[in-house]
């Protein structure tokens, strides 16, 4: 199977998000990379489902809360930008203050 670099990046991100979901399910708090991966995968999957950029910008702020991540992580992530594939093409989705 031949994958482009972008496709490899998407698979790596999705794999990291799966690890993050499993750790949350075990009651562990997420670190910086896990938090970014989980929110980014949420945005990418929402885009694939046909949600709007505006709704993903808002919904992306409710994926994680402070009590689900390690201390200091919310301050390390002022915003997350994801180039996601929507039914009508690729668009940049920015989520400001993603962990409240």
Curated annotation (Swiss-Prot):
Compartments in which it is found: Cytoplasm
Reactions mediated catalytically: urea + 2 H2O + H(+) = hydrogencarbonate + 2 NH4(+)
The record's SUPFAM superfamilies line, in alphabetical order, gives: Urease, gamma-subunit
Q: Does the record's keyword annotation contain Cytoplasm?
A: yes
Where mainly found?
cytoplasm
Taken from the UniProt entry, a GO cellular component term is: cytoplasm
Q: Which pathway does it take part in? A: Nitrogen metabolism; urea degradation; CO(2) and NH(3) from urea (urease route): step 1/1
PANTHER family per the UniProt record, alphabetical: UREASE (PTHR33569:SF1)
Q: What family, per the record?
A: Belongs to the urease gamma subunit family.
Relate the assembly described in the record.
Heterotrimer of UreA (gamma), UreB (beta) and UreC (alpha) subunits. Three heterotrimers associate to form the active enzyme.
What is the designated name of this protein?
Urease subunit gamma
Q: Which gene encodes it?
A: ureA
């Amino acid at each position: 199977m031949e994958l482009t670099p972008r496709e490899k990046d998407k698979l790596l991100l999705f794999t990291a998000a799966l690890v993050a979901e499993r750790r949350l399910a075990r009651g562990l708090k997420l670190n910086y990379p896990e938090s970014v991966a989980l929110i980014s995968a949420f945005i990418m999957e929402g885009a694939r489902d046909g949600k709007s950029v505006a709704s993903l910008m808002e919904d992306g702020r409710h994926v994680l809360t402070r009590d689900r991540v390690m201390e200091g992580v919310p301050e390390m992530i002022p915003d997350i930008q994801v180039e996601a594939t929507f039914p009508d093409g690729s668009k940049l989705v920015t989520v400001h203050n993603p962990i409240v």
